[in-house]
């Protein structure tokens, strides 16, 4: 993502999903922990959303803005990272990313979308670990 954007300095980055897995507020070994730390170290303006784990995550990273919805998280973002496969994320459409984000650039660590569908929908999409 840094190679694509050149810098994260003062760039809004959306993070969807903080929990280790859906249906829990458990953060143990959650990929979001290290990745958010790296984004902060590179100067990103990180905005996170998780329907259950946000409060626990905010205790660890009180400086991070926690959004109240997916739409608020994506609004004006230059890129989005998905770290938990919550059902409400799976239901998102390429149009939602295009409409809300400044740059519809998505890095999906859970492989919840079909890459071809996202690309046809106008989203620059990277499925990590597929």
Predicted regions located by residue number:
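Structural/interface elements that position substrates and couple domains in central-metabolism enzymes
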Residues: 1-130
């Amino acid at each position: 993502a840094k190679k694509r954007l050149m810098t994260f300095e003062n760039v809004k980055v959306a993070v969807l999903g903080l929990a280790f897995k859906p249906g829990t507020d458990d953060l143990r070994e959650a990929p979001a922990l290290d990745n958010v730390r790296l984004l902060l170290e590179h100067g990103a303006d990180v905005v996170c959303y998780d329907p259950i784990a946000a409060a626990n995550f905010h205790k660890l990273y009180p400086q991070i803005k926690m959004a109240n919805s997916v739409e608020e998280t994506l609004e004006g973002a230059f890129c989005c990272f998905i770290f938990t496969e919550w059902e409400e994320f799976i239901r998102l459409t390429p149009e939602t990313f295009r409409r809300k984000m400044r740059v519809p650039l998505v890095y999906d660590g859970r492989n919840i979308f079909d890459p071809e569908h996202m690309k046809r929908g106008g989203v620059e999409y990277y499925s990590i670990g597929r």
